Amino acid sequence: MTGKEFNAYCKSLKATTHVVQWGNAHVWKVGGKVFAIGSWDGGGWEDKEPAFTFKVTDIGFEVLPQQPGVRPAPYMASRGLKWVQHYESPGLSDNELKDYIKQSYDMIVAALSKKKQKELGLLP
């Protein structure tokens, strides 16, 4: 997945906002809470390939880093948060990456108050 594809996918999710911060990282939020971070072209990480960071379940945090190209997210995981980073090929396929980003988005939305979800148009 390219950085452009990452941004387009995150933008397609309802009520998201985008900001560039933390050394040119592309940070995607819903309700003011981060659900995905993308970095490329020297945007904060030294890796040559794009890096995509996202929240995962407890099981995902145990299983995903066993795959080549996926590791616990360097900053987030060191603070006890369940985030992983796809940082090099072969890693996850684009479809798998989109699925995990969507799951991250869904977890963040579920953690928002019902009032906030309604304000964002995420509840009927």
Please tell me what each predicted stretch does.
Residues M1-P124:
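Charge-dense, helix-prone N-terminal extensions
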